[in-house]
Amino acid sequence: ATNQHFDLLAYLCDNFGGDIHISLGMTTRSEEAAVVRFFERRGRASDLVLYACTSGYPVAFDDVCLLEIERLKRAYGNIVKTIGFSGHHLGIAIDAAAQTLGASWIERHYTLDRTWKGTDHAASLEPDGIRRLVRNADAVARSLTYKPQELLDVEIPQRSKLKWGTRVEN
């Protein structure tokens, strides 16, 4: 909500040496371009992490708009440090898809009880949800690879049993 508060962003640029993470929820494309230009002028664009985000609590799946991750990567991927995803949806399935689309960071709200009063508790994850999200994110990260060889070791015994034309007759 403060990504247009340029005095605050200037203070961060001048006084904080780490990565600066900015959500683009509730932000127009001209406003997001202004944020990136601001960080470029200050020599800090390479420390900027932009988050694709739809701000709502909770956000319907139809409004998550995951392909914004790809759009941001095309528009700013060579300028900023990386692109992330900030989710305010129910569940954790969307986060795995965001990771598959190239989101380097996943940001979710955390609560001890989703029934508590407040704007974002309903869209937040409870402790078990966070554990499942981390488990799934790890599985997705490990599986996003190419085969290092034509046949993996796990496939060789299956191939000799199941693939037509590869059985050795006695």
Descriptions of predicted regions:
Residues 1-170:
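Catalytic cores and adjacent flexible loops of soluble metabolic enzymes
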